[in-house]
């Protein structure tokens, strides 16, 4: 619900004018405040997990209640063509943190694995990547991350924490080093490598049946087999079972953990109190750093399955458990925004809200939909080309600096947040690497009418599925699809029966010639254009093709973080509270803020 406190507060005129003066200084680069922390805006970045762009009232949903996010949009700038750089958690967040496509850091699929699978894998965001947190830290900011990380933990030994948030510019971390999955809820079916797990269990049963058959045959005298051979085969079967069950049999204990900085504080985590713990930590962080400046990246666990929702919100929405979780997320965000206002920081805080990618259409429990709604846009999570997989909310808020109620339809990217916040604090983006994002400051303020992106490239794993051309002279936004997933069943708009749609192989269609859409006239990508229906068809295909060729010249080989050797669970890398393998601990209290 909207807070009366948020509606009724008004800061003194002198304080209200301060952000405006700072903004003009940063924009025009005519002054550089060196010492006064008050001249640097606090940065609050809020990212939902798996939220569909059609799930919010401010984006057209009139059946889910999201008053706090809607108010943020009313008081700020709302982007309607805001795009994730990847359609899955790990690569999208890597791109967000670094302002670079995830494949540039090796943080995207080179095989069947498209996201990190274990806390105890050795893959993760490389140490030589620069996050916006590191740059802000160098400019005197306190930098905190609360919530989901999913960018890896260790490289070579338990505790080296080479991929840990504290090794990437954050000086405080509280949350999940991994991500929520169904495995975190004992009452849900398995999710992490569920198909492989079922296959390994089948092999184990086959081996056990063979060993029992040999033992029975030898005992009954049906055939002659030495006891040593039977014992040896039984040993092999046991070793095989232990080799996979030691990881897959304890997914909840290995992956579903909470950490504070370098220490595991809860293993496995108690889902029912997690939301309260995250809220308590966020409010506490704001209060501790209210004299600023601070960066707080609030990386929400909502609204990823298993949709852990407190009793206060269960059964309250019109859309089942998913809707309940969305409305709880909005309430939690409202509490955080209240903390900003209660500490007198509303007019000195740059706030941003988004989702890491589109809603998860395939997330179902029988006939119940457990994933988000992507509005008019085709596709969803896991689909790198279709709009539903990559179009996300984008809301920016800074009273007195950004115009209230402004709506921008220009193509923008999650990768743009990196150079945007770096510019706001007076920093510079790295000059020794490709940065794919562009600062949104001129666009948000109204100094520029057009996005700096002429072309945007949309990947599924390391496969280029589509490209977007924002034609400057006409204003048209053309979208070329080179590869699309094959929906199952045909025409369903998703790949039901599997976790997400594939990026390559037999489950995709390669289009020769490519599909072409004009998003400015057909944002739902319902009517592909042809040479007969669009006179510019061949010219557009050729121009986008040339841009793709130029883009590919910027690519260079890097170590693959999702390689099989990096993805595998390694017991010596497992974060552990206590003595491995007897890892167990719980936080005191219920997390009530």
Curated annotation (Swiss-Prot):
Signal peptide: 1-33
Listed InterPro entries: Alkaline_phosphatase_core_sf, Sulfatase, Sulfatase_CS, Sulfatase_N
Assigned GO CC terms: endoplasmic reticulum lumen; lysosome
Modifications made to the protein after synthesis: The conversion to 3-oxoalanine (also known as C-formylglycine, FGly), of a serine or cysteine residue in prokaryotes and of a cysteine residue in eukaryotes, is critical for catalytic activity.
Record's cofactor remark: Binds 1 Ca(2+) ion per subunit.
Name by which UniProt lists this protein: Arylsulfatase D
UniProt cross-references to SUPFAM superfamilies, sorted A to Z: Alkaline phosphatase-like
Origin superkingdom: Eukaryota
Chief location bin: other
Pfam families per record: Sulfatase, Sulfatase_C
Co-factor requirement: Ca(2+)
Known glycosylation sites: 61, 128, 347
Entry's localization field: Lysosome
Tissue-specificity statement: Expressed in the pancreas, kidney, liver, lung, placenta, brain and heart.
Entry annotation: catalytic residues: 89, 150
EC number annotated for this UniProt entry: 3.1.6.-
Record-level Gene Ontology MF annotations: arylsulfatase activity; metal ion binding
Name of the gene encoding the protein in the UniProt record: ARSD
Tagged with keyword GTP-binding: no
Modified residues (3-oxoalanine (Cys)): 89
Annotated binding of substrate, by residue: 148, 304, 381
Keywords tagged on the record: Calcium, Glycoprotein, Hydrolase, Lysosome, Metal-binding, Signal
Enzyme class: hydrolase
Binding site for Ca(2+): 49-50, 89, 356-357
């Amino acid at each position: 619900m909207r807070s009366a406190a948020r509606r009724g507060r008004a800061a003194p005129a002198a304080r209200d004018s301060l952000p405006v003066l700072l903004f003009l200084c940063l924009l025009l680069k005519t002054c550089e405040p060196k010492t006064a922390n008050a001249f640097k805006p606090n940065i609050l970045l809020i990212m939902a997990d798996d939220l569909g762009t059609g799930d919010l009232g401010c984006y057209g949903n009139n059946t889910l209640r999201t008053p706090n996010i809607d108010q943020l949009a009313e008081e700020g700038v709302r982007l309607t063509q805001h795009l994730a750089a990847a359609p899955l958690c790990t690569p999208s967040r890597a791109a967000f943190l670094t302002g670079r496509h995830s494949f540039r850091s090796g943080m995207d699929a080179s095989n069947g694995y498209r996201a990190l699978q274990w806390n105890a894998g050795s893959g993760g965001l490389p140490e030589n990547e620069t996050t916006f947190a590191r740059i802000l830290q160098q400019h005197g900011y306190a930098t905190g991350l609360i919530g989901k990380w999913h960018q890896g933990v260790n490289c070579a030994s338990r505790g080296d924490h080479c991929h840990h948030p504290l090794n990437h510019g954050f000086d405080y971390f509280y949350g999940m080093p991994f991500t929520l999955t169904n495995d975190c809820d004992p009452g849900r079916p398995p999710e992490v490598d569920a198909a492989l797990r079922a296959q390994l269990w089948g092999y184990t049963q086959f081996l056990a049946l063979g060993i029992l058959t040999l033992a029975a045959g030898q005992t009954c005298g049906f055939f002659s087999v030495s006891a040593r051979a039977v014992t040896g085969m039984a040993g092999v079967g046991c070793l095989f079972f232990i080799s996979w069950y030691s990881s897959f049999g304890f997914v909840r204990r290995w992956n579903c953990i909470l950490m504070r900085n370098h220490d595991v504080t809860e293993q496995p985590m108690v889902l029912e109190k997690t939301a309260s713990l995250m809220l308590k930590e966020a409010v506490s962080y704001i209060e501790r750093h209210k004299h600023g400046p601070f960066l707080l990246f609030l990386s929400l666990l909502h609204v990823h399955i298993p949709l852990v929702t407190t009793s206060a919100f269960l059964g309250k929405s019109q859309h089942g458990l998913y809707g309940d979780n969305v409305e709880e997320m909005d309430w939690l965000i409202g509490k955080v925004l209240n903390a900003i206002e209660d500490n007198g920081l509303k007019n000195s805080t740059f706030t941003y809200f988004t989702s890491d990618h589109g809603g998860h259409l395939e997330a179902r429990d029988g006939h119940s939909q457990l994933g988000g709604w992507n509005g008019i846009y085709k596709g969803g999570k896991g689909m790198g080309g279709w709009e539903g997989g990559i179009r996300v909310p984008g809301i920016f808020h800074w009273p007195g600096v950004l115009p209230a109620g402004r709506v921008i339809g220009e193509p923008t990217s999650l990768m743009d947040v990196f150079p945007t916040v770096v510019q706001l604090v007076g920093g510079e983006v790295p000059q020794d690497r490709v940065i794919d994002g562009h600062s949104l400051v001129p666009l948000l303020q109204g100094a520029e009418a057009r996005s700096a992106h002429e072309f945007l490239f949309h990947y599924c794993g390391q496969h280029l599925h589509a490209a977007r051309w924002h034609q400057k002279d006409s204003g048209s936004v053309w979208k070329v699809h080179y590869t699309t997933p094959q929906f199952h069943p045909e025409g369903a708009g998703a790949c039901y029966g599997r976790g997400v749609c594939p990026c390559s192989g037999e489950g995709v269609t390669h289009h020769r010639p490519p599909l072409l859409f004009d998003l400015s006239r057909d944002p739902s990508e319902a009517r592909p254009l042809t040479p007969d229906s669009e006179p510019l068809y061949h010219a557009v295909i050729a121009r986008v093709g040339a841009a793709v060729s130029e883009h590919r010249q910027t690519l260079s080989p890097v170590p693959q973080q999702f390689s099989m050797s990096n993805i595998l669970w390694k017991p010596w890398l497992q974060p552990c509270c206590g003595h491995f393998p007897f890892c167990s601990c719980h936080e005191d209290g219920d997390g009530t803020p």
